[in-house]
Amino acid sequence: AAYALPQEVAWGEKNCRTAYLYAVTTHPDFRKRGICAKLLAYAEKELTKRYFDCLTLVPATDALRSYYASLGFVSQNTAFFDEGGAPEARGVCEVLTPAEYAGLRETVLYDLPHVRYGLSDLRYQASMSGFYRLELGSHFGCACAHPDGETLVVDEILPDCSVLPALLKQLPAKQCRVRTVGGSAPFAMCKWLSDAHMPDVYLAFDFG
């Protein structure tokens, strides 16, 4: 089985249609028969006919990453930081609605190729994490985060970790695990179906 979630990739004034593939699974009794490859080939064919420009997914393991690479998917980089001890809380942190977060996020990411999330995507993400506006001195940003015991899991912080202390004002924690744009850690994978190719697309949420 596989599911395709329609999304949009944006870069400045450019945008194109993408399908986020998730829950790609083969029953254990039918593995190693090429069924997954045939399923993805069928999805690619059908989505191309529907004028989608690319496919994105997030592999759960390194072995799956290698497998998807053999099918033409290319890893897109992002940055992960295990901060260890959380920084001292300082600055201003305000709770945002999904609509408010969408607007602020697009402003911050305007110059970078990224997946633009619709309100339905963000409302689903809001069932797992909160959205926040951050201010620290002259620095402004936004974040999506949730506590996990004594660790603050930051699903996204923009434009970078410079505004992380402000997030701790709303969500105190002893440790932080952070994802942000840039860096060289492989995360999402992308396969282009058209000539609307964009470099290193940033995808934040795997909706896992």
Spans of model-derived segments:
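Conserved acetyl-CoA-binding loop-helix of GNAT-fold acetyltransferases
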Residues: A23-T26, K32-K45, S70, P159-P172
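Conserved beta-strand in the GNAT
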Residues: A1-Q7, T18-Y20, T25, T56, ...
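C-terminal functional modules
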Residues: A185-G208
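Conserved active-site alpha-helix within GNAT-family acetyltransferase domains
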Residues: F52-C54, A60-T78, G183-L193
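Structural motif
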Residues: D155-D160, V178-S184
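Conserved GNAT acetyl-CoA-binding A-motif
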Residues: L40, L47-A60, A173-G183
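Amide-forming acyltransferase catalytic core, primarily the GNAT-like/NAT-type
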Residues: L71-E156, C161-S162
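Core nucleotidyl-transferase/polymerase catalytic module
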Residues: L5, Y22-A23, A43, T61-A63, ...
